[in-house]
Amino acid sequence: MPSGRVVGRTRPIATGSTGERRLLSPALLIAVLVVGGIVVLSAVLIGSPASPYACASQLQPQANATVENPIVTPDEGAGHVRTGTTTEYASCPPASGPHYTEGGGVAPLRPAFYDSGARIGPANWVHNLEHGYVVALYRCPDGQCPSNDVLSELREFVLNGPPTESATACGVSSKVLAARFDDMATPFALVAWDRVLLLDTFDAQVGIDFARRWLEQPELAERGSC
């Protein structure tokens, strides 16, 4: 954890209960869905509790933030921690910081749309950010998720993410994914390493434009990794 250690946590989240036993071999269940005539992948991580985490605060929207000039967050490092460790972040949604490194589609995650029941958290997808991914996040407060039309926009974003050389080398169409994350001030967010764009609405083209700008940032040591 970097020098600004988390203190006075607001609404700390620890979603993996202590009484829950983790299966030895978590699996990624991939389903092929047809949404509005478009075939998309939907993923659910099963056999593993959601990654526990804690945030000192929620990142707040900035009126002048755009795709080209999103919120720049302080770099919290890229430390690898053991799966199941509670990871701590200065703000949520995090755009850097400690994360799991289990592999096998657990951390980093495979590029896909993850439905609201997927048992994942920042410690999973922050590893994707380190590898140059862009992650779209959606919120389901009190279980009230976005409408099917909006979820279709998120799936379209995943389906049409910009290609990169490393994505091709990794055997995927694009290094983007979408996942539920409730601990944020707006219904949606687009996240790259140290970059966050908080959104009240989600449009697939905005997500694609953000990804085109911020995928595979050259300063990332592991940007070519899968």
Q: Model-found features: residue ranges?
A:
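Hydrophobic membrane-insertion alpha-helices, especially the h-region
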Residues: 27-44
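Hydrophobic, helix-length membrane anchors
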Residues: 45-50
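Ordered hydrophobic segments in well-structured contexts
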Residues: 88, 126, 133-137, 175-179, ...
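Terminal targeting segments of Actinobacterial cell-envelope proteins
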Residues: 1-24
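Surface-exposed, low-hydrophobicity interaction/linker segments
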Residues: 51, 57-124, 146
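Mid-length scaffold segments of soluble, non-membrane domains
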Residues: 112-168
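Helix-rich interaction surfaces within compact, conserved domain-sized segments
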Residues: 157-226
